[in-house]
Amino acid sequence: MSGPARTGVLLYAKDLALVSAFYERVLGARVVHSDPEHRVLQSPDVQLIVYAIPRQVAEGIVIGVPPVPRENQAIKPFFTVESLAVAETDVQQTGGRIWGPVWPGPGMKVRNVCDPEGNLLHLRETAA
Protein backbone atom coordinates (compact mmCIF):
# COMPACT_ATOMS: atom_id res chain seq x y z
CA MET A 1 0.00 0.00 0.00
CA SER A 2 1.36 3.42 -0.82
CA GLY A 3 0.10 6.58 0.83
CA PRO A 4 -2.26 6.91 3.76
CA ALA A 5 -4.79 4.15 4.45
CA ARG A 6 -8.35 4.85 3.35
CA THR A 7 -9.87 2.83 6.19
CA GLY A 8 -8.68 1.61 9.55
CA VAL A 9 -9.20 1.41 13.27
CA LEU A 10 -7.65 3.55 16.02
CA LEU A 11 -7.49 1.89 19.41
CA TYR A 12 -6.35 3.41 22.70
CA ALA A 13 -4.17 1.25 24.95
CA LYS A 14 -2.88 1.49 28.49
CA ASP A 15 0.03 -0.82 27.60
CA LEU A 16 1.07 0.10 24.06
CA ALA A 17 3.60 -2.72 23.61
CA LEU A 18 1.30 -5.46 24.94
CA VAL A 19 -1.74 -4.45 22.89
CA SER A 20 0.34 -3.92 19.75
CA ALA A 21 1.96 -7.37 20.11
CA PHE A 22 -1.51 -8.93 20.44
CA TYR A 23 -2.79 -7.45 17.18
CA GLU A 24 0.48 -8.07 15.35
CA ARG A 25 0.25 -11.77 16.15
CA VAL A 26 -3.50 -12.36 15.89
CA LEU A 27 -3.94 -10.36 12.67
CA GLY A 28 -0.53 -11.15 11.18
CA ALA A 29 0.06 -7.39 11.00
CA ARG A 30 3.42 -5.70 10.74
CA VAL A 31 4.53 -2.46 12.35
CA VAL A 32 4.97 0.20 9.67
CA HIS A 33 5.58 3.09 12.06
CA SER A 34 6.36 3.29 15.75
CA ASP A 35 7.14 5.99 18.29
CA PRO A 36 6.58 6.29 22.06
CA GLU A 37 2.96 7.42 21.58
CA HIS A 38 1.64 5.04 18.94
CA ARG A 39 2.23 2.14 16.57
CA VAL A 40 0.78 1.81 13.11
CA LEU A 41 0.08 -1.81 12.17
CA GLN A 42 -0.69 -2.96 8.65
CA SER A 43 -2.21 -6.22 7.45
CA PRO A 44 -3.48 -7.02 3.97
CA ASP A 45 -6.99 -6.04 5.11
CA VAL A 46 -6.69 -3.19 7.60
CA GLN A 47 -4.53 -0.52 9.14
CA LEU A 48 -4.71 -0.43 12.92
CA ILE A 49 -3.29 2.43 14.96
CA VAL A 50 -2.62 1.61 18.61
CA TYR A 51 -2.32 4.84 20.56
CA ALA A 52 -0.96 5.06 24.12
CA ILE A 53 -3.38 6.50 26.64
CA PRO A 54 -1.67 9.46 28.33
CA ARG A 55 0.01 8.40 31.58
CA GLN A 56 -2.10 10.68 33.81
CA VAL A 57 -5.27 9.06 32.43
CA ALA A 58 -3.87 5.50 32.28
CA GLU A 59 -2.97 5.57 35.98
CA GLY A 60 -6.68 5.53 36.83
CA ILE A 61 -7.51 2.56 34.59
CA VAL A 62 -7.49 -0.95 36.05
CA ILE A 63 -7.03 -3.85 33.64
CA GLY A 64 -7.86 -7.33 34.97
CA VAL A 65 -5.76 -10.43 34.41
CA PRO A 66 -7.24 -12.26 32.65
CA PRO A 67 -8.83 -9.30 30.90
CA VAL A 68 -12.47 -8.56 31.59
CA PRO A 69 -14.32 -8.15 28.27
CA ARG A 70 -15.88 -4.71 27.89
CA GLU A 71 -19.34 -5.88 26.96
CA ASN A 72 -20.73 -2.34 27.01
CA GLN A 73 -18.38 -0.93 24.37
CA ALA A 74 -20.16 0.92 21.59
CA ILE A 75 -18.25 -0.64 18.69
CA LYS A 76 -16.84 -4.10 17.99
CA PRO A 77 -14.53 -4.28 14.99
CA PHE A 78 -14.26 -7.51 13.03
CA PHE A 79 -11.22 -8.99 11.36
CA THR A 80 -10.84 -11.94 9.01
CA VAL A 81 -8.21 -14.53 9.92
CA GLU A 82 -7.01 -17.54 7.95
CA SER A 83 -7.79 -19.97 10.78
CA LEU A 84 -9.90 -19.48 13.89
CA ALA A 85 -8.04 -22.33 15.58
CA VAL A 86 -4.67 -20.65 15.05
CA ALA A 87 -6.09 -17.25 16.03
CA GLU A 88 -7.55 -18.69 19.25
CA THR A 89 -4.11 -19.98 20.25
CA ASP A 90 -2.53 -16.63 19.35
CA VAL A 91 -5.16 -14.77 21.39
CA GLN A 92 -4.47 -16.83 24.49
CA GLN A 93 -0.68 -16.73 24.12
CA THR A 94 -0.64 -12.93 23.84
CA GLY A 95 -2.79 -12.14 26.86
CA GLY A 96 -6.24 -12.08 25.27
CA ARG A 97 -9.29 -14.16 26.04
CA ILE A 98 -11.76 -16.29 24.08
CA TRP A 99 -15.32 -15.02 24.62
CA GLY A 100 -18.29 -17.23 23.79
CA PRO A 101 -18.84 -19.98 21.24
CA VAL A 102 -18.04 -20.21 17.54
CA TRP A 103 -21.08 -19.30 15.43
CA PRO A 104 -21.79 -20.30 11.85
CA GLY A 105 -22.45 -17.47 9.44
CA PRO A 106 -23.09 -17.25 5.71
CA GLY A 107 -19.82 -18.47 4.19
CA MET A 108 -17.91 -18.09 7.45
CA LYS A 109 -17.61 -19.01 11.09
CA VAL A 110 -17.11 -16.35 13.73
CA ARG A 111 -15.86 -15.97 17.29
CA ASN A 112 -15.62 -13.14 19.79
CA VAL A 113 -12.37 -12.57 21.65
CA CYS A 114 -10.95 -9.75 23.70
CA ASP A 115 -7.50 -8.25 23.61
CA PRO A 116 -5.28 -7.98 26.73
CA GLU A 117 -7.12 -4.83 27.83
CA GLY A 118 -10.65 -6.22 27.41
CA ASN A 119 -11.55 -4.67 24.04
CA LEU A 120 -13.93 -7.05 22.28
CA LEU A 121 -13.42 -7.95 18.66
CA HIS A 122 -14.99 -10.38 16.26
CA LEU A 123 -12.79 -12.84 14.34
CA ARG A 124 -14.02 -14.42 11.11
CA GLU A 125 -12.78 -17.41 9.16
CA THR A 126 -14.22 -17.62 5.67
CA ALA A 127 -15.18 -20.93 4.10
CA ALA A 128 -12.55 -22.40 1.81
Where are these regions (language model features)?
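Conserved active-site tyrosine of GNAT-family acetyltransferases
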Residues: 19-24, 91, 118
